Amino acid sequence: MNYLNKIRIENPLTICYTNDVVKNFTANGLLSIGASPAMSEAPEEAEEFYKVAQALLINIGTLTAQNEQDIIAIAQTANEAGLPIVFDPVAVGASTYRKQFCKLLLKSAKVSVIKGNASEILALIDDTATMKGTDSDANLDAVAIAKKAYAIYKTAIVITGKEDVIVQDNKAIVLANGSPLLARVTGAGCLLGGVIAGFLFRETEPDIEALIEAVSVFNIAAEVAAENENCGGPGTFSPLLLDTLYHLNETTYQQRIRIQEVE
């Protein structure tokens, strides 16, 4: 857990432009791993913040016409500052409006990581793809989708699901940790986007090992939380997840990580 240990020592400032539903949970999750979250949204202060920040999360869960230009502006400011961006195109396939905005953002700024479920990433590479919501997934080939997205956007791809797929540096990794309860908590996937950002340390071309550790730390913590005798369902799972992120140690991490490199 080299990256998590570094986070716990250095408390990296992680800027989160995220959706209104998940701000509190995302901030608390980042605090639990040792990062310092800032839920800053004003383009007017971005230049100053981004000089000292370590990464920026952009999550479009509550995209509106009023915040479109702000998102483009902060992404471009992050590029100018050399700040890595984790982009979470929430429900991109649910509407033409979302898809058009995501395409515009990806043309207007360079992101370091695109993170979403298989349907969301498919919607970014296939104009005919649609989805029913943020958790839609129709038995898609996540590895193939991730590889194609990586080839198109030339950026790291993280696809979440029953198994998670990471493609970066022309490598494809499948991770098999996690808990079904993650799908029963609004904002769990959004928090993962923030966690990934917390692991980047101003690396605009992140090492695949940082991405593997970020996703695995989150999902192993979810497993441990779900197995806790005090976990009775989604309501008790959420705080236990935060507690487990806070306490996770190297022994548990190494014993539980399930990882496979694929062709």
Curated annotation (Swiss-Prot):
What's a Gene Ontology MF term here? Answer: hydroxyethylthiazole kinase activity
Q: What's in the keyword line of the UniProt record?
A: ATP-binding, Kinase, Magnesium, Metal-binding, Nucleotide-binding, Thiamine biosynthesis, Transferase
Q: Does the keyword Kinase apply?
A: yes
Query: CDD domains of this UniProt entry?
Result: THZ_kinase (cd01170)
Pathway-wise, it operates in: Cofactor biosynthesis; thiamine diphosphate biosynthesis; 4-methyl-5-(2-phosphoethyl)-thiazole from 5-(2-hydroxyethyl)-4-methylthiazole: step 1/1
**Catalysed reaction equations from the record:** 5-(2-hydroxyethyl)-4-methylthiazole + ATP = 4-methyl-5-(2-phosphooxyethyl)-thiazole + ADP + H(+)
| EC number per UniProt | 2.7.1.50
InterPro entries to which the protein is assigned, alphabetical:
Hyethyz_kinase, Ribokinase-like
Name the Gene Ontology biological process terms: thiamine biosynthetic process; thiamine diphosphate biosynthetic process
Instruction: Identify the domain of life.
Output: Bacteria
Identify the residues that bind substrate.
M39, G187
Q: Which cofactor does it need?
A: Mg(2+)
Binding-site list for ATP: K115, T160
Xref: Pfam families? HK (PF02110)
- Which family does the similarity line name? Belongs to the Thz kinase family.
Function, in words: Catalyzes the phosphorylation of the hydroxyl group of 4-methyl-5-beta-hydroxyethylthiazole (THZ).
- Which protein are we looking at? Hydroxyethylthiazole kinase
What organism, scientifically named, is this protein from?
Staphylococcus aureus (strain JH9)
